């Protein structure tokens, strides 16, 4: 009898969570779908807006967590961003499908999804460029062709060429020495970026994101930093050249995780291009300045890759189900990669959490920092590392850590306040009574000359 009840409840839950239909969703449809998922899974989701587009459309995010709206210490934050280019729409539809899938599988008690939601705070932004999407969708309905129609925002700006250029600073510092992380924004950055870009920058500064992927279209490849080439310009264009980050091996692994879990990306030959293993260094493919994935790596703790997911930027509705089946496992596996490396708390001797402590790994010239709650996350490949935590006013602490291939290693730091060194005693010349310095006696020049002559030996007659 209990088995029949269990089957009935399973079917009831499956029926209540109606799947997202495989069709393109305009802005109003997208908003309805996000709130539909939230209504179906209210205890593990939250819908929030990070700002508005040029045309006033909200940039909505759907959050999945067992405590929506709350950062739990030692629980990593991960994000997906879709539709940055308005006419590259597959990512938008995949993220809607993923949202419904996470909700449905959580309610069906799929233990893999339950564990993912309970141990991770997931943020899904289906569309960063809703204005551009509406232009592209309207053109499709009118059968207007154009490779770039709807790509940019309503001001005609490519949002993936609109972030502050921090690569110049890191390339200089790699050669001459200097900071290797969290490069500051220019003083006038807000006047140089679009509303959508500004909203995303403020968003990623507000959350301690650890891992991210930016979903695009027009090719099928997993692209990892750096995007901007270190090479010299040739005829006004920056020369294509492999430009790795200090975390190059880790980024390659993250890209391969997606590529090999994808239905066909790993095969390499797609859309007339060949990429070994279905991955590429961004600058090795083509150099791109002011891109979002480099900005994430250089300004925050977040490791982001760019996923090019379809040859056709605006695939037909009939192709969406196949694309979803080809990407579903890869989307889940990539989220799970946030649980690797090391993580822990940084505290002082009184167990107060220390924010902005710097976590350095020997041999990797890129540091991360602890968040507002004192927790830090450092993605690493399996191996043995020397890890140091530092904070102003505290003695550094260094430990040796062996990282395995599965769960992240918990490494806490408890920093001791630096003991101020006693200043060496200084000899004070001409010390007089009560510590006063007595001035030297000053003689007139003539008197000094006469005194000198008198001290010289007198010569007798020859």
From Swiss-Prot:
Principal subcellular localisation of the protein: secreted
Binding sites annotated in the UniProt record for Zn(2+): 85, 88, 216
Start and end residues of each Peptidase M14 domain: 23-338
CDD domains: Peptidase_M14NE-CP-C_like
Subcellular location: Secreted, Extracellular space
TM stretches of this protein: none
Pfam families reported for this sequence: CarboxypepD_reg, Peptidase_M14
Domain of life: Eukaryota
Glycosylation: residue positions: 402
EC number of this enzyme: 3.4.17.3
Leader sequence residues: 1-19
Record's compositionally biased regions (Basic residues): 424-448
Entry annotation: catalytic residues: 308
Gene3D superfamilies: Carboxypeptidase-like, regulatory domain, Zn peptidases
MF terms in GO: metallocarboxypeptidase activity; zinc ion binding
Gene Ontology BP term (one): protein processing
InterPro entries in the record: CarboxyPept-like_regulatory, Peptidase_M14, Peptidase_M14_domain
Catalyzed reaction equations: Release of a C-terminal basic amino acid, preferentially lysine
Protease is among the record's keywords: yes
Family in the record: Belongs to the peptidase M14 family.
Quaternary organization: Tetramer of two catalytic chains and two glycosylated inactive chains.
Protein name as annotated: Carboxypeptidase N catalytic chain
Origin organism lineage: Eukaryota, Metazoa, Chordata, Craniata, Vertebrata
């Amino acid at each position: 009898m209990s088995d029949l009840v269990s089957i009935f409840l399973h079917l009831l839950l499956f029926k209540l969570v109606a799947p997202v239909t495989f069709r393109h969703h305009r802005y109003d449809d997208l908003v309805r779908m996000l709130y539909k998922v939230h209504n179906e899974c209210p205890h593990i989701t939250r819908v929030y807006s990070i700002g508005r587009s040029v045309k006033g459309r909200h940039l909505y995010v759907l959050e999945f967590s067992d405590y929506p709206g709350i950062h739990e210490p030692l629980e990593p934050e991960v994000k997906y961003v879709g539709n940055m280019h308005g006419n590259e729409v597959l990512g938008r539809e995949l993220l809607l499908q993923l949202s419904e899938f996470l909700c449905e599988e959580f309610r069906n008690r799929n233990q893999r999804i339950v564990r993912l939601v309970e141990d991770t705070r997931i943020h899904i932004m289906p569309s960063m460029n809703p204005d551009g999407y509406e232009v592209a969708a309207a053109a499709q309905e009118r059968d207007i062709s154009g490779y770039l129609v709807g790509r940019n925002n309503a001001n005609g700006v490519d949002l993936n060429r609109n972030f502050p250029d921090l690569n110049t600073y890191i390339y200089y510092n790699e050669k001459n020495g200097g900071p290797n992380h969290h490069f500051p924004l220019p003083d006038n950055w807000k006047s140089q970026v679009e509303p959508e870009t500004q909203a995303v920058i403020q968003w990623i500064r507000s959350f301690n994101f650890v891992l991210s992927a930016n979903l695009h279209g027009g090719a099928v490849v997993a692209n990892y930093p750096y995007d901007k080439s270190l090479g010299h310009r040739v005829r006004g264009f920056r020369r294509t050249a492999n430009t790795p980050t200090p975390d190059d091996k880790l980024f390659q692994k993250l890209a391969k995780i997606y590529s090999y879990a994808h239905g066909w990306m790993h095969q390499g030959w797609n859309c007339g291009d060949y990429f070994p293993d279905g991955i590429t260094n961004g600058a090795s493919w083509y150099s791109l300045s002011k891109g979002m994935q480099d900005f994430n790596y250089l300004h925050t703790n977040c490791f982001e890759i760019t996923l090019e997911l379809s040859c056709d930027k605006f695939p037909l509705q009939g192709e969406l189900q196949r694309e979803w089946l080809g990407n579903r496992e890869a989307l889940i596996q990539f989220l799970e990669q946030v649980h690797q490396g090391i993580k822990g708390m940084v505290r002082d001797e009184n167990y107060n959490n220390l924010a902005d402590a710097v976590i350095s790994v020997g041999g990797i010239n890129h540091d991360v920092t602890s968040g507002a709650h004192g927790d830090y996350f450092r993605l690493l490949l399996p191996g043995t590392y020397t890890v140091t935590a530092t904070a102003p006013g505290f003695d550094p602490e260094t430990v040796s850590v062996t990282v395995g291939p599965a769960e992240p290693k918990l490494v806490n730091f408890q920093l001791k306040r630096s003991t101020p060194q006693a200043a060496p005693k200084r000899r004070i010349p001409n010390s007089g009574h009560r510590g006063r310095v007595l001035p030297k006696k000053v003689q007139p020049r003539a008197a000094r000359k006469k005194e000198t002559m008198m001290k010289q030996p007198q010569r007798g007659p020859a």
